[in-house]
Amino acid sequence: MGVFAGDSKTAKVGLLCAASVGAVAAVATGALAASRIKTLCSLKKLSSFAGAYNLYESAVAYRYDLDAIIESGVEDDQAYIDAVCKQVFPGIPVKVEAPKFACSAFCAEAPSSVLMGRNYDFKDDTSALLVRTHPKDGYASISFSALNNLGANMPEESLKSKVAAMLGPFASLDGINEKGVSIAVLTLDSLPTRQNSGKPKINTSLAIRLVLDRAASTQEAVDLLGSYDMVAMAGRDYHFFINDASGDSRVVEYDPQNPARPMVVTHAREITNYYACYANEVLPNQKNGALGHGKERALAIAEVLDGVQLQTKEVAWKALRCSSQEPNPEDITSNTQWSIVYDNINCTADFVLRRNWSEVFSFVV
C-alpha cells in the first residue's frame, strides 16, 4: 500500500491555462475572470495509470450561489445543468450529461476515528476528480466526481474538457466537510422520486452539495434535506448515506410504496442498492423489485465489521475489497470505479481508483 502526493503535469497544464485566459476574458472581467482562471489552472493529474482513467484534483476559486440555482427551478436535469453553467462559467456553453450513481457504503468506529467506507460502482469506466471547495458562507470540503459524467475523462487533453471539469462541485458523488460530515449517494431500482409538496425543489446532486456546504452534523443534514422537495436525476432513483464525527450514520430515502414519496430516515451501519427502510423485505443475490438489490454486499461488509473488536482503517479496506465488483456490462451497479475510507474525526479521505488496491491517495480537508 502506497501513499502518493501526485504529479501535476506542470508543462501541459500551464499551456492549457494560457489558452484558457482568452476564453474566460471573452465573457468575464476582473474578479469574475480571475477566479475562473485560477480554478482552471488548479487542475492537476495525481496518478499515472496506463490508459484513459486517472485521478485529478481541482480547487474551486470562484463563488457560487446554491440558493440562486434552487430558485431558478430544477424540475429536470437540463434546467439544473443550465443553472449550474450560469453560476460556474457564464457565457460559455458546456454540454454535460446528467450523472448516475451506484455503490456500497458503511460506517465503522475505532477508538480515535469514525470511518465511512464507500465503493462507487458503475458499469461505465471513469476518471475521478477530487474537488476542493470552501464557500464564503459554508464549510470547506473535499468531494469526488466522475469525470465520465462530465464528458472529460482526460481533462488535460483539451480546453473543452478542462472547462467541463469546472462543473465538478455540482456532480459530486460523495465527500466530507470540515465538520466531519460525510455523504454518499447510491442508486436504487424504484421509479425516480418527484416530490411535489410545495417546498423548494432540489435534485440528487444539489443534495450532496448542500450537505457538504451547510451541515455540521448528520441531524443537520437530515433537517436540511427535509426542507426541500426531491427530484431524482438521470431517470433513476437514489438514497443517501450520511455519517458524522459522532458516528451517527443514517440512510435518507424516499418511500417507494407511498405515492407522495415522503422522506424516510433509517439508522444503518451499512447499505448498498436497496431500501434501508424495507431491509427486512429484501433478499440477497436477487432483484427485489422496487425495493432494490445488492444485499449480499451489505452482508459481506457486516461480516467483516462484526468479525473484529476494533474497526480500523485496515478493517474498513477489507470490507471495501470484499464488497467491490468486477465489470459486468449487464449490471449498471457493477464495476467499482473508486473506493474511499473517510475519517470523520480527522476529516481525511484515503482513495483507491479502479481496484488498484496497492496505490492509496490520501487527502485532508
Listing of model-derived features with the role each one plays in the protein:
Residues 287-314:
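Long, charge-rich alpha-helical interaction segments
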Residues 3-4, 13-16, 20-216, 230, ...:
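N-terminal mature-domain region immediately after signal-peptide cleavage
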Residues 7-8:
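Intrinsically disordered, low-complexity coil/linker segments enriched for acidic/polar
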Residues 209, 222-226, 302:
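Short, well-ordered alpha-helical packing segments
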